UniProtKB/Swiss-Prot annotation:
The keyword Metal-binding does not apply. It is found in: Virion; Host nucleus; Host early endosome; Host Golgi apparatus. GO terms for cellular component: host cell; host cell endosome; host cell Golgi apparatus; host cell nucleus; viral capsid. One of its GO terms (molecular function) is DNA binding. Minor protein of the capsid that localizes along the inner surface of the virion, within the central cavities beneath the L1 pentamers. Plays a role in capsid stabilization through interaction with the major capsid protein L1. Once the virion enters the host cell, L2 escorts the genomic DNA into the nucleus by promoting escape from the endosomal compartments and traffic through the host Golgi network. A motif (Nuclear localization signal) lies at residues 1-12, 446-454. This is Minor capsid protein L2. The keyword Phosphoprotein applies. Interacts with major capsid protein L1. Interacts with E2; this interaction inhibits E2 transcriptional activity but not the DNA replication function E2. Interacts with host GADD45GIP1. Interacts with host HSPA8; this interaction is required for L2 nuclear translocation. Interacts with host importins KPNB2 and KPNB3. Forms a complex with importin alpha2-beta1 heterodimers via interaction with the importin alpha2 adapter. Interacts with host DYNLT1; this interaction is essential for virus intracellular transport during entry. GO terms for biological process: microtubule-dependent intracellular transport of viral material towards nucleus; symbiont entry into host cell; viral penetration into host nucleus. Highly phosphorylated. Belongs to the papillomaviridae L2 protein family. It comes from Pygmy chimpanzee papillomavirus type 1.
Amino acid sequence: MAHSRPRRRKRASATQLYQTCKASGTCPPDIIAKVEQNTLADKILKWGSLGVFFGGLGIGTGSGTGGRTGYVPVQTAPRPAIPFGPTARPPIIVDTVGPSDSSIVSLVEDSTIINSAASDFVPPIREGFEISTSETTTPAILDVSVTTHNTTSTSIFKNPAFAEPSIVQSQPSVEASGHVLTSTYTSTISSHSVEDIPLDTFIVSSSDSNPASSTPVPTPVARPRLGLYSKALQQVQVTNPAFLSSPQRLITFDNPAYEGEDISLQFQHNTIHNPPDDAFMDIVRLHRPAITSRRGIVRFSRIGQRGSMYTRSGKHIGGRVHFYTDISPISAAAEELEMQPLVAAAQDDSGLFDVYVDPTPGPVAVQNMSYPSSTSFVRSSMFTTKWGNTTVPLSLPSNIFAQPGPDIIFPAAPGVPPYNPVIPSLPITPIFISGSQFYLHPSLYLARKRRKRVSLFFADVAA
């Protein structure tokens, strides 16, 4: 006979023990603390909940069922479905018409129908203020005082026997007669009220100190900066005049009959060559010319691009050169030159001798004529250039007749005095300088700084 073990009975839970022993007061302290959530873990949660909020998760010493209500899944409310298709129209209620109803519908009620049963409504009348009338009827009379004026009679007539002389222009005849009323309280005579209004002039006068209107200063047009004198450009001065008209002749040997336009010029050098001008070596591009003014001169400039090195991709590497030549200087102010007249304005014939020949000359004896020297008639001066008439002796044969002609007067120029060196009145004596003291120039006070030698190789340091 097999031995049967007794069935194991389940122990009561802490909640069941708390319900039976709480009334009698025999509950163990751990059961009371567990049921009333007063254990050490519950106290830590209470103290930590002062700074941290766990959202009512029911964290405690229970069985982990999520508290009394358990765990509830978090769900979001579904969106309402949007109906598709046309919406239904609300029904229209139509009144039915019976066979005995009238088919004519009157829009306006007949005004001839009198409702005898209804009474007409009369609105109540409220009482207003009372108007008091007086029995005495006295007309209103205004007290108007009449102002007395003195009457003055004035008559003006024109007397034909007396006429006042006119100053500027003749005055028309005036004949008038009438009465002028003047007030006893005022001393001026006026027929109506007059308002004094100052006259405004519309003539605008201006001066240099106070202009009448403001003329806006036009904004200066910003000129492009050429940058011809930057550090990136090599400055080369060209003295060949062909640089102005045909610069391509300085780079390559072209056709001299062809003259290109003033545009950028490009050159291709397939082989090594020497240009006509060594300054234009390896020039592959010459930009268009630019005329500028610098330091009082007119300068003709062109920028050139050298093609000293080419890469495999075909790009050339080279410096930029500024070729320039000075055309002419710019004078600050034009020189004033006094022009001398070619013919003298005043003619002085006092010291002049003209050559006149008798219109009816007689026979000339050749054997008796003398040939004087020209020095006795021609007078010359070394330091004066005054022109005048000179008498020239003529030794004519007997068969040639001389006719008198006009006098030729040359312009007179001012005489230049001769240069005489000034001889000093005092005798010239030699000057001897002797002494041991001297003054050093201020620029030599500071000694020159000696440059420190910097070693570039390790061999210099070792030495």
